[in-house]
């Protein structure tokens, strides 16, 4: 045992804590209820390290060990790679591949052109990852554009599925999960109704992602749970002529077999991979970028609000650290640096920033209302 290791044992640190010295921590990439995600330099290059406060998962430590076990078993070109893990007296550290190529929609909007053919091949990549998970009885439960990342800035970079924080491994193939999980607007009806759910929830989310990728807006516009549930279960999926006239019928059919309210009637990942649209044969060469750019503008304004929330989460997490002098929680500066132009101005996160963020959120709501009204008029005239 090294001298440093002996000192760590004397200070009550677990044996694996020695690994921490291999990493130099950098900017904060995000924060949640249980901890933060930091960029770091390691022996094999840059990585992402998820830091979880043990105090925040007390009594639910098995949740962390389950995530670790699952990540170590998953090996797929379109799933973020597990690197290592270690722990301290008060924290767990999960080290994974760092995807630096940007989120799905940001990367697409930086291109000169993005067609329906490109969209079908993008969705195919993600669907192969979902199919791999389902073959291994794993349900992701939080599929959304923000969790779809490019590994590098290279034009031919792989797209990977990330964030397995609420993913569940089924004990038996047909096990039913009952906890609320997922993100508003992407969660399946059975999740919102708390009826019990399984693999079909991922297929619903894939339907929402595909729809948004093809037109730049969500198929469901409600802003509260009750209205959203009604919209998902009682109303037909809308394909507004103005935005969908240049999109193939195959693409619409693909979406419709995924956005089926009854989970038992929803297509599986295997069936979806066999759909003709994912072959790209009948997909059009219509450029989707104008609609997607509008989506990105709305997303950027939402990020301004998220940076304020991020700083508040980090502050709360720091309060729970046993040794604040050796904090690993970082700050929100790094996250704002990831989105220069829309978030970097808020690094101080003072009262002015909060006020500015609220004003931008209000402006966004006004813009969306005007957009909805414009669509209603155009739809009625279609």
Curated annotation (Swiss-Prot):
Residues 23-278 form the Protein kinase domain. InterPro entries: Kinase-like_dom_sf, Prot_kinase_dom, Protein_kinase_ATP_BS, Ser/Thr_kinase_AS. Keywords: ATP-binding, Calmodulin-binding, Kinase, Nucleotide-binding, Phosphoprotein, Serine/threonine-protein kinase, Transferase. Belongs to the protein kinase superfamily. CAMK Ser/Thr protein kinase family. CaMK subfamily. The keyword Nucleotide-binding applies. It is an enzyme of class 2 (transferase). Pfam families: Pkinase. Gene3D superfamilies: Phosphorylase Kinase, domain 1, Transferase(Phosphotransferase) domain 1. It comes from the Eukaryota. ATP binds at residues 29-37, 50. It comes from Metarhizium anisopliae (Entomophthora anisopliae). Residues 291-301 are annotated as: Calmodulin-binding. Residues 318-344, 359-382 are annotated as: Disordered. Its EC number is 2.7.11.17. The active site is at 142 (proton acceptor). The keyword ATP-binding applies. GO terms for molecular function: ATP binding; calcium/calmodulin-dependent protein kinase activity; calmodulin binding; protein serine kinase activity. It catalyses: L-seryl-[protein] + ATP = O-phospho-L-seryl-[protein] + ADP + H(+); L-threonyl-[protein] + ATP = O-phospho-L-threonyl-[protein] + ADP + H(+). PROSITE patterns: PROTEIN_KINASE_ATP, PROTEIN_KINASE_DOM, PROTEIN_KINASE_ST. This is Calcium/calmodulin-dependent protein kinase.
């Amino acid at each position: 045992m090294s001298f440093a290791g002996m000192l760590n044992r004397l200070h009550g640190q677990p044996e694996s804590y020695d690994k921490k010295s291999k990493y130099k921590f950098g900017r904060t990439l995000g924060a949640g209820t249980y901890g933060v995600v930091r960029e770091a330099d390691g022996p094999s290059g840059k990585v992402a390290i998820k830091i979880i406060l043990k105090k925040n998962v007390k009594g639910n430590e098995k949740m962390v060990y389950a995530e670790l076990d699952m990540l170590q078993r998953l090996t797929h070109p379109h799933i973020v790679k597990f690197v290592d893990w270690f722990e301290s007296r008060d924290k767990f550290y999960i080290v994974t591949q760092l995807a630096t190529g940007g989120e799905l929609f940001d990367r697409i909007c930086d291109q000169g052109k993005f067609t329906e053919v490109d969209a079908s091949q993008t969705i195919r990549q993600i669907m192969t990852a979902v199919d791999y998970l389902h073959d291994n009885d794993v349900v992701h439960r939080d599929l959304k554009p923000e969790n779809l990342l490019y590994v590098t800035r290279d034009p031919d970079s792989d797209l990977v599925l990330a964030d397995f924080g609420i993913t569940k491994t089924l004990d038996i193939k047909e096990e039913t999960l009952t906890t609320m999980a997922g993100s508003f607007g992407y969660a399946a009806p059975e999740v919102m109704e708390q009826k019990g759910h399984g693999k079909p929830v991922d297929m619903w989310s894939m339907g929402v992602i595909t729809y948004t990728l093809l037109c730049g807006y969500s198929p469901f516009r409600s802003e509260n749970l009750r209205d959203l549930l009604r919209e998902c279960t009682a109303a037909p999926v809308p394909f507004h002529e103005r935005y969908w006239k240049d999109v193939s019928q195959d693409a619409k059919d693909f979406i419709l077999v995924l956005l089926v309210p009854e989970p038992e009637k929803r297509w599986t990942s295997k069936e979806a991979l066999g759909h003709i649209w994912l072959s790209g044969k009948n997909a059009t060469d219509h450029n989707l970028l104008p609609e997607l750019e509008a989506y990105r503008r709305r997303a950027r304004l939402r990020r301004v609000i998220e940076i304020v929330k991020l700083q508040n989460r980090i502050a709360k997490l720091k309060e729970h650290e046993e040794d604040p002098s050796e904090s690993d929680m970082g700050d929100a500066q790094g996250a704002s640096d990831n989105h220069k132009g829309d978030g970097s101005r808020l690094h101080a996160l003072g009262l002015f920033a909060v006020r500015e963020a609220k004003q931008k959120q209000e402006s966004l709501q006004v813009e969306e209302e005007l957009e909805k009204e414009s669509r209603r008029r155009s739809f009625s005239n279609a």
